[in-house]
């Protein structure tokens, strides 16, 4: 079985070498995340080159995600690198930069004084230190606070203001420079930090459009109350979400985070947009070779919630066991997926879905694939939308996306249950189906004889036109004739031109291939699993006997006795009147 949940790994000092990246890819990494809160362009450029080299060596499709620093508020530097703030003491926050002391610090956002009011809470260093606003002195440019929770405050720590709408820009100048660097480097995703409203996403989209890079997808990171409140408009503008539980858990009470996680995942699922669950998933594996039981449950529950991808941060960027962390996540995901109730999920999502043609096809494909227990769903695609829409219904069968576009292939690295295979561009429907089936076989996920569902859009090459579904047997069609009965049979051919030859050669379960049958052949026919004759006619002896015995018969197959060889393994499909090479899964 192949894992369907995707794994995002943050690349850092512990994982940036080509050899280590190869190990991560072989362990199961699908997307490499680069955190632009740390490091410069030169450092990230080297990492991107190493990721590409490792992907080339392994022959795997691995996407690159650029995670922006975002418009966050931080403290400036402290005296001697750190100060101690004591509970109950007064602390002044200056809007002008000063070197921090236990009496006064400054922040990177001068407009904070306009956004907060008396009684507001200000959190420092991921909420470890909390302050309450006592007074706001706009003339002096200072906020006077009382320390509610003390602790040691170091340089450049994060500042959060729960429940307060801050007027930070959508993207900063640093973000803009980082995104332009990413465009030049050919990245696949931008994870936009601290998204609060749809306009934050559109600001990035405009930048991409101005540089002819609209193919790069935007994943909105939901990290604050405002982002949660505006989730519907954000999802309309973004290509997917990241549930960034770290910063979210600072601004929102810890007990609310699991509920918000479920809400955000469900909203993405309903729209068929990918969602990543992130932060502290296997946090203890930064130091230990095994996860805690709570962490294993956390990963499993995110998958039960419906996440497309699970993410590793410090575990792979700076931890002692980066490869082990990926292997562990792979095993947890694989085992959890075996417990998914695909029929229940499909039924629920069908009720909640929209009434579009693509949605209707997506539902039909998932239902058909489940009812027929097909080996795979094959989706030739130009834009990646078809496999994404099918994945929305969480089919049991793997989804093989066949595309001529390498960038589309990488974008699908984030979508649940989708495996990609590149194939040449085609112009006709017949060519598209042939190329898709060939690519599916090359992927190793299906083999000759397997039953698959193919879904695509016609005319070929048009984006967003998913309107076709075909149930297909991947097999070599050897012969066609008039089928009798709806059954199918698999066995070894027994070629006999006379009754005597048939009686001598026939074995139980063999498939009798002859010119025509008569009463003298009955001892051989009674052992047969199926009959193929050159003689045609629905009232021929073979047709009548086959119906009587309840075995499939195909009549009117030209040159059958020379076409088939003794002992050749074949499948007879009475309903379709076809004979396939080998063991084919026919209905």
UniProtKB/Swiss-Prot annotation:
Its EC number is 2.7.1.40. Pfam families: PEP-utilizers, PK, PK_C. This is Pyruvate kinase. Catalyzes the phosphoryl transfer from phosphoenolpyruvate (PEP) to ADP to form pyruvate and ATP. Has a broad specificity for nucleoside diphosphates and can use ADP, GDP, IDP and UDP. Pathway: Carbohydrate degradation; glycolysis; pyruvate from D-glyceraldehyde 3-phosphate: step 5/5. Homotetramer. ATP binds at residues 35-38, 74, 157. Mg(2+) binds at residues 223, 247. Can also use manganese or cobalt. It comes from Geobacillus stearothermophilus. Contains an extra C-terminal sequence (ECTS), which contains a highly conserved PEP binding motif. InterPro entries: PEP-util_enz_mobile_dom, Phosphohistidine_dom_sf, Pyr_Knase, Pyrv/PenolPyrv_kinase-like_dom, Pyrv_kinase-like_dom_sf, Pyrv_Knase-like_insert_dom_sf, Pyrv_Knase_AS, Pyrv_Knase_brl. It catalyses: pyruvate + ATP = phosphoenolpyruvate + ADP + H(+). NCBIfam families: PRK05826.1, PRK06354.1, pyruv_kin. Changing residue 308 to E: Reduced activity. The gene is pyk. The record marks 221 as: Transition state stabilizer. The N-terminus is blocked. Keywords: Allosteric enzyme, ATP-binding, Glycolysis, Kinase, Magnesium, Metal-binding, Nucleotide-binding, Potassium, Pyruvate, Transferase. Substrate binds at residues 33, 221, 246-247, 279. Its cofactor is Mg(2+); K(+). The keyword Transferase applies. Belongs to the pyruvate kinase family. Optimum pH is 7.2 at 30 degrees Celsius. Optimum pH is 6.8 at 60 degrees Celsius. PROSITE patterns: PYRUVATE_KINASE.
């Amino acid at each position: 079985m192949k894992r369907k949940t995707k794994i995002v790994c943050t690349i850092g000092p512990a994982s940036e070498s080509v050899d280590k990246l190869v190990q991560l890819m072989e362990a199961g990494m699908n997307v490499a995340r680069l955190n632009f809160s740390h490091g410069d362009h030169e450092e990230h450029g080297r990492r991107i080159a190493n990721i590409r080299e490792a992907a080339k060596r392994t022959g795997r499709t691995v996407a690159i995600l650029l995670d922006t620093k975002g418009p966050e508020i931080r403290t400036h530097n402290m005296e001697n690198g750190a100060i101690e703030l004591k509970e109950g003491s007064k602390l002044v926050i200056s809007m002008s930069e000063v070197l921090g002391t236990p009496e006064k610090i400054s922040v990177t956002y001068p407009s904070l004084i306009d956004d907060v009011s008396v009684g507001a809470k200000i959190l420092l260093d991921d909420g470890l230190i909390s302050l309450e606003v006592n007074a706001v002195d706009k003339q002096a440019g200072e906020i006077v606070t009382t320390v509610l929770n003390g602790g040691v405050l170091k340089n450049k720590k994060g500042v959060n203001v729960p429940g307060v709408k801050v007027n930070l820009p959508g993207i900063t100048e640093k973000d803009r420079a980082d995104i332009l660097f990413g465009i030049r480097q050919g990245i696949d995703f931008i994870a936009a930090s601290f998204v609060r409203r749809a306009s934050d996403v559109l600001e990035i989209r405009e930048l991409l459009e101005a540089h002819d890079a609209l193919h790069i997808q935007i994943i909105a990171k939901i990290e604050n109350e405002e982002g949660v409140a505006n989730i519907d408009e954000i999802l309309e503008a973004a290509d997917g979400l990241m549930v960034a539980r770290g910063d979210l858990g600072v601004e929102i009470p810890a007990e609310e985070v699991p509920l918000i996680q479920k809400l955000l995942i469900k909203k993405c699922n309903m729209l068929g947009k990918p969602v990543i669950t992130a932060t502290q998933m296997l946090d203890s594996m930064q130091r230990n070779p095994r996860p805690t039981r709570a962490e294993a449950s956390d990963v499993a529950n995110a998958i039960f919630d419906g996440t497309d991808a699970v993410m590793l941060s410090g575990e792979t960027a700076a931890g002692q066991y980066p490869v082990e962390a990926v292997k562990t996540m792979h095993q947890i995901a694989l085992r959890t997926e075996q417990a998914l109730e695909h029929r229940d999920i499909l039924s629920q999502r069908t009720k909640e879905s929209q009434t579009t043609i693509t949605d209707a096809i997506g539902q039909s494909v998932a239902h058909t694939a489940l009812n027929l227990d097909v080996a795979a769903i094959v989706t030739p695609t130009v834009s990646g939308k078809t496999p994404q829409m099918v994945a929305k219904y969480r089919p049991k069968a793997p989804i093989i996306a066949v595309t001529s576009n390498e960038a589309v292939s990488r974008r699908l690295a984030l979508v649940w249950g989708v495996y990609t295979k590149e194939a040449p561009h085609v112009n006709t429907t017949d060519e598209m189906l042939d190329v898709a089936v060939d690519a599916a076989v090359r992927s190793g996920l299906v083999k000759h004889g397997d039953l698959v569902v193919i879904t695509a859009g016609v005319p070929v090459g048009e984006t967003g036109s998913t309107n076709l579904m075909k149930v297909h047997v991947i097999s070599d069609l050897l012969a066609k004739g008039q089928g009798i009965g709806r059954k199918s049979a698999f066995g070894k051919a027994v070629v006999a031109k006379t009754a005597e030859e048939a009686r001598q050669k026939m074995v139980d379960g063999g498939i009798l291939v002859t010119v025509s049958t008569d009463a003298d052949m009955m001892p051989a026919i009674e052992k047969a699993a199926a009959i193929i004759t050159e003689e045609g006619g629905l009232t021929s002896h073979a047709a009548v006997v086959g119906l009587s015995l309840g075995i499939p018969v195909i009549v009117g197959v030209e040159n059958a006795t020379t076409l088939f060889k003794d002992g050749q393994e074949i499948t007879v499909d009475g309903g379709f009147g076809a004979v396939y090479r080998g063991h084919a899964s026919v209905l």
